[in-house]
Amino acid sequence: MGPLSGVKVIEVAGIGPGPFTAMMLADMGADVVRVDRADRAGGDPEVPPADVLYRGRRSLGVNLKSDEGVQVVLDLVEHADALIEGFRPGVAERLGIGPEECLERNPALVYSRMTGWGQEGPYAHTAGHDINYIALAGALAHLGRAGEQPTPPINLVGDFGGGGMLQAFGVVCGLLEAQRSGEGQVIDAAMVDGSATLMTMIWAFRAMGIWTDERGTNMLDTGAHFYDTYETADGKYVSIGSIEPQFYAELLRLSGLEEHLAAKGKELPYQMDASHWEELRGELAEVFATKTRDEWCEVMEGSDVCFAPVLTMEEAARHPHNVERGTFVEFGGITQPAPSPRFSRTPGAIQRVPAHPGQDTDDVLVDWLGMDDSGVAALRDSGAVA
């Protein structure tokens, strides 16, 4: 029984950040029902979809272009604590399931709207993807190496960090407030806003005069030799994050950088003298190229260098640290990340494998709305659900 056990959530099916929010809530015990399009219903329940982003919740197939289908969603709203939708601004209203209609049915509902640009603004009604949202937020400009083009971070910043994860935080905040006030509200969760929020520390560094807009020249963006990745003798990589003086001293001791420089007749410059960072990166690159990744693990693991091997997804799932912690689990025959964060008394858990669209229509109508078989059959016959 996770910490959100007893909470009921409607997820109007979408892609990316919305499903991630719903997955996080379901992992923590919420009863999440995904409203899928009726015309996409079907699939062999014995062969669940491989998209584990859809794990943990039931699916109801609904025709939102029919009045009866819309009424089904509004009936569900009466029993829900929260609703998540990811349409462009105005679409939910045109369908008849916008905030006004839903809050009229359930004044305590937390209604969360996930978009890239937000509900208003010059870009609000235009298409976009993660790369565009983090570009406008000022985040993408700082990802990549000096002299090279910005590098998209595989949708982690916009869709999932600044999008789905912050929306989940917003929904839980809304639920807590609704418990106190008895009133619901609308959440405008925009990926451009969330991505900007994730940049707060960098804005602080900029205000402090220790960060510039020149990509790849700052301490945390591959500008510094002591905070970077290095190729090893076998073509693999290791990561180094030796920022603090005591950690940097460990890096020097275990890498032999100082001796490497002395052999060339060079002295070791002050760590924070940025004018030497590029030169020292080249020297460290030579050092790390002398051993394989596993050999460097033997040298540095267990120390205070701030070191870790750069692993592929497959390697990460097998690493002893992750295995001991259960960071990854096999569920439904698919290896995937385990629910996070961890609770000592009410831990989260993957509740079920992903459902095909409409796989649980009858079950949801009976469970949430108390319908009998004839009522369910009538809705199916009308085409309102599938």
Q: Which residue ranges define each predicted feature?
A:
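Flexible glycine/proline-enriched surface loops and loop-helix/loop-strand junctions
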Residues: 149-158, 231-236, 346-349
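N-terminal helix-loop segment corresponding to the beta1-alpha1 unit
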Residues: 1-170, 174-180, 356, 362-386
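Terminal low-complexity tails and localization/encapsulation signals of metabolic enzymes
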Residues: 1-8, 231-233, 315-386
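Conserved PLP cofactor-binding pocket of PLP-dependent enzymes
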Residues: 301-322
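Glycine-rich beta-alpha junction loops
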Residues: 117-118, 191-196, 234-236, 242-247, ...
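Aromatic-enriched alpha-helical interface/lid elements that frame and gate functional surfaces
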Residues: 226-303, 307
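Conserved Rossmann-fold dehydrogenase catalytic segment
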Residues: 119, 148-158, 179-195, 215-222, ...
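Oxidoreductase and adenylate-handling cofactor-binding alpha/beta cores
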Residues: 137, 163-185, 197-208, 250-259
